[in-house]
Every structure is written in structure tokens, then in C-alpha cells.
A protein has these predicted regions:
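Active-site-proximal beta-strand elements of phosphoester/diester hydrolases
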Residues: 1-12, 96, 109
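Active-site beta-strand/loop signature of hydrolases that rely on acidic residues for catalysis
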Residues: 3, 17, 25-54, 74, ...
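Short, basic, glycine/proline-bearing loop/turn elements
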Residues: 6-12, 51-58
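Catalytic metal-binding/acid-base residues of hydrolase active sites
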Residues: 9, 42, 86-87
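Alpha-helical structural signal in soluble globular domains
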Residues: 27, 69-77, 98-102
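A short acidic, glycine-rich active-site loop
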Residues: 55-68
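Active-site catalytic loop in hydrolytic enzyme cores
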Residues: 60-62, 88-124
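Short, basic/aromatic recognition patches
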Residues: 71, 80-87
Length: 124
């Protein structure tokens, strides 16, 4: 299996990040990659480092045009992808990695799991 890792500098503009994602999918497919993996929260700057900022403009659902666009690009380019989006489900927001197959179908989901507040355990 040939895996492409998308190295992106994210902008505050979702559309710019989306277009860059589509471009990277095409490039990975042209180079015969089977799967392309994207960075955390790929359509926005990495905002978790700024806990007080308003990030509502970056929230989406799996039905958003951006997720559908990535799915279409996978189908058109015959490549699997693992994009990462800031998703809202049932009133909760978190980043979620999807696994999209080469037919554009979502075949896997992984929600972010944060272990904040857990005490460090002793290792021997």
C-alpha cells in the first residue's frame, strides 16, 4: 500500500483549505497513492491552542458540502482518504477522522478522545 501524507499550512479561510485538500487528493492519486491522510482539523487553523476563540464557523456535519466534496474527489480519483473535520453531533463538538474509500463511501469514523485531567501513572 502506498500512503500519501498531506502536509498543509491551514489558512483561516475554509474554502482555501478545502481547495488545497482537493488538489492534494489529485496529486496523491497521480502519484499512485492508495490512501491520503490529512492533518488534524484540516479545513481550519489549529484552534485548540486558543481555548477562548469562537470557532463556530468551522463546525460542520458529515452532510456538509466540504465532506461531500472530499468524498466526490475520492470517487473521481479512485483513492482512499482519511480527512479530519471539526464535527458537531448531538450537541457535542470534536474533531473526527473519517475513512473514505475509493468509491467515495465513508467506511470508518474515529472521534477525538481527550484524556484531560487524568493523573500520570507511574511506570517501572
Amino acid at each position: 500500500m502506498k500512503i500519501a501524507l498531506a502536509q498543509m499550512k491551514m489558512d483561516t479561510d475554509i474554502e482555501k483549505n478545502f481547495q488545497k485538500s482537493l488538489q492534494l487528493i489529485c496529486e496523491a492519486a497521480e502519484k499512485k497513492a492508495d490512501l491520503i491522510c490529512f492533518p488534524e482539523i484540516q479545513l481550519s487553523p489549529f484552534f485548540p491552542q486558543f481555548p477562548d476563540c469562537d470557532v463556530s464557523e468551522y463546525v460542520m456535519t458529515e452532510d456538509s458540502s466540504y465532506v461531500k466534496g472530499i468524498r466526490n474527489a475520492c470517487r473521481e480519483n479512485h483513492i482512499f482518504a482519511s480527512p479530519n473535520f471539526y464535527i458537531e453531533e448531538k450537541g457535542h463538538r470534536y474533531d473526527m477522522s473519517l475513512l473514505i474509500d475509493d468509491q467515495g463511501e465513508i467506511i470508518g469514523r474515529q472521534n477525538e478522545i481527550v484524556n484531560n485531567g487524568w493523573q500520570v501513572f507511574q511506570t517501572v
